[in-house]
Amino acid sequence: MSYTMGIDIGTYETKGVLVDIKGIVVSEAKRKHKMLVPRPGWAEHRPEEDWWNDFCFISKTILKESGINPEDVKAVASSAIGPCMLPVNSSGNPLMNGVLYGVDNRAEKEVRELTAAIGEDLILKKCGNALTSQSVGPKILWFKRNCPKLYEKTDKILTSTSFIVHRLTDQYV
């Protein structure tokens, strides 16, 4: 029989499910993690501990509890909180904690500056949304300005989902 595994990494927990070809839940698991708040207005996750280790723990737990042969899992779907910002080096290793979506507002100054420089109308026309604490672009600008040594070591900036996909496939998406 064929199975599909789905794992979702959320703000406060990771949950996963294994379903058969008919969509019947065979096994499920969840694991809590913390949102770090190193300063007021900041929100972070530890990518290794909170994203990757949770993903592996949930996968192993679901497979063990289901008793199925892992080779019968034909697809793995992953979703994760976003949009997040995670700088990685050329080996794909995180250079800092992942900066979370709209709950992290460290780049408020950059949001204001970019909106003033580009214009709200043009941003809306090109992006379909205003720049907010949800936007990754201003967070990247904040990172460049405030962490120049880490920025120089950055090979790519990933989302939480692209970090998981890279760990699974050694590919960047």
Spans of model-derived segments:
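N-terminal glycine/serine-rich phosphate-binding loop of ATP-dependent small-molecule kinases
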Residues: 1-97, 125, 153
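Glycine-rich phosphate-binding/catalytic subdomain of phosphoryl-transfer
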Residues: 57-173
